[in-house]
Amino acid sequence: MQLLNSFLGFAASIAVLASSADAAPTLYKRKSKSNTNTAKSVAILDGVGVNNTFGVISYREKFPMDYHIWHTAPSTGKTYLQPWNDAVEPSTYYIDEGTFLRTGLKFAYIGDNMDLAFTNHTDWKASKHDDGTHRVDLSQRKPANNFMATQRCGKLDPFGYQLKRSKKVFQACGTQVFVGSGRSIDCQWMDSVALNLSRYYGNTEALSSLPLPRNLSADIPAKSSRLFPHGIYNFNFSAPNKRMQRFTASEATTVNGQNQSVYLTYDVPYGRSLYYYTSCALEFRFTNEFFPMDVTPNDGSAQFVVYNMSGNPKKQTTSSKGPTRLYEVARFNCTTRGCEYTQNIPCPRAGHSHTYELAPASPNTSISWIQSYSPRIGVTLQVYSNANFD
């Protein structure tokens, strides 16, 4: 084995993690090839395994909680659900042969407040001093083991693997990640999904620096509220009796005769206007900033359409019994490099949940992505009311 001689870092173009004596994975920023059509989404659904690089995204199914990617701060080692202090980039992790959770050279440990943090100061055992006593160096930390990611997340439409420690899930207290129970009532249990990135970050060539295709034609005011979907369903119309689950990795496809759309449900709050908003828009932002997204065909001709729906799907709804299309509200093109659009739409009624369907506009077309809060990836809904800010 080789000694790890560089730390893990994410930059805008390229990040390198050198090989390690502990069989740490080798990481590079992936390359985006315009002449290939490999389904990048498949790689992140593979098992996590030992020493395989993965990213972590957390959500809560029973209570609406947006998809949050884990960020570990380089200075403190503490772990957050969004950028915080110097934790500005999403982090990657791996589980070694001893079931220790690691990021680069650093091991996970459990802090004094049961917070999940990482450190490379792990010479925690008692050592003999000049006076003959054995004392523990309190500046050192005992690495925590018993981390595992072996159980698929989701039963009906599984994606990724559940990350747990000692068979228990993690807690979110504000934006910080904790281990164990007995914390404040403001904390909540959450599901954490490990998505394999070993193949995705196995390339040495940087992402293209070309700008994303975009059309910022919407006129949404600056004080708009941005809403993230609280339900993401893959509806397979080729299997009309297959039940769908509420949270999954998104994929809309008509490739090889498939017929699958993505339903996105938003909880639209009341404003001071009570029942209406005056300006609304859908924002589409698909990039390869962290988790991979994929588009077929990749020559820029892939077009997708969004429909307003007659109602909202429920957990375990089948496509044969789900809501129906009312009318088209948006249309956009995308490539494997990504795309970014904002389009005005008719406003949904305030104080209710509302669903939109994203579907390929033609045969042999597909798009797959992982919805996340930060970096903002996927489809968000902007709502604005004149009465909200009187």
UniProtKB/Swiss-Prot annotation:
Keyword vocabulary terms for this entry: Ubl conjugation pathway
Q: Which InterPro entries match?
A: Ubiquitin3-bd_protein_But2_C
Q: Does the record's keyword annotation contain Aminoacyl-tRNA synthetase?
A: no
**Keyword check for Transmembrane helix:** no
Report the sequence similarity comment from the record: Belongs to the but2 family.
Quaternary structure, from the entry: Interacts with but1 and uba3.
State the protein's name. Answer: Uba3-binding protein but2
Source organism of the structure: Schizosaccharomyces pombe (strain 972 / ATCC 24843)
